[in-house]
Amino acid sequence: MNKPSSKNAASADGGFEHIQAFFDTTRGQITIGEIPPIRRAALAAVGKKARVALVCGETESVADLLQRLNVALGKAAAEDIVIDEVLPEIKRRR
């Protein structure tokens, strides 16, 4: 599979500079999908340490979730914090 050129990727990525920086500076991973009992979520982690965990709203698009993930990764990196919407939501549902 051919990768897009940097020029094409920059225009197609929607400005995901913090997601790019996360990949460039860590050996981390980003997962989008189910984190039971949460049907739709996004998780950015390095090893077993979550940096950002977001719950996708019922009407939120994947593009909107990725944009929120990008902003949250920027904040987490700048402030050296963990942003976790998932654990409070799991506790709320118990």
Say what each PLM segment does.
Residues 40-84:
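Amphipathic alpha-helical packing elements
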Residues 1, 26, 30, 73-76, ...:
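Short, flexible helical or helix-coil boundary motifs
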Residues 33-35, 55-58, 86, 93:
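Compositionally biased, intrinsically disordered low-complexity segments
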Residues 2-13, 79-94:
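Short, charged, intrinsically disordered terminal tails
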